[in-house]
Amino acid sequence: GKAYQTSGGLHGVGASVVNALSSSMVVQVARNKELYEQRFSRGIALGNLEKIGNASNRRGTYVTFLPDKEIFGNHKFKPSRLFKSIRSKAYLFSGVEIRWKSEIRDGETPTDATFHFPGGLSDFLNETLNGVSTYANHPFAGSVDFNEKFQIPGKVEWAINWTPSRDGFVKSYCNTVPTPEGGTHESGFWAAILKSIKTF
């Protein structure tokens, strides 16, 4: 179905909303050893994309923004909440390196950190279950790209392990947005797992 086709967006929806709600947003892209920059204010481009220099040792995208005080007043970010969100994104985009830097010191969240999880969801599950007895030494993990297999847009990834304890947990995401109350994608996934186990 189309229920989750556009909700949450990978970066298009998020970036446009952040842009509209920021008094200043600067995007820098280091690509092919060159550094490009574009500046925005309240959703409006302040100029064209410009090459601003060389970037022989850099790569990736850097986004800096200031929330618009006319909209948000003097509200402050909660670094711990953002830190957890960014960490989960690093698990969801296996292999991507995300560098965290915060000028807000709250006493519990690091001001600098680097997240890189080549194993993606398996790394998340192993870290979460650290020290917990499991039936399998390694998570049952994989992914299916629906476009390659069925010629429809979409992809599913998973990592599962079983423990002797009844205290299990499920964490699901749709378009990198947490879905704490599950949803049709989670129900369908568990139905497929149960059917596969019964068939086995």
Predicted regions and their residues:
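GHKL/Histidine-kinase-like ATPase module
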Residues: 80, 88, 95-200
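GHKL-type ATPase core
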Residues: 1-130
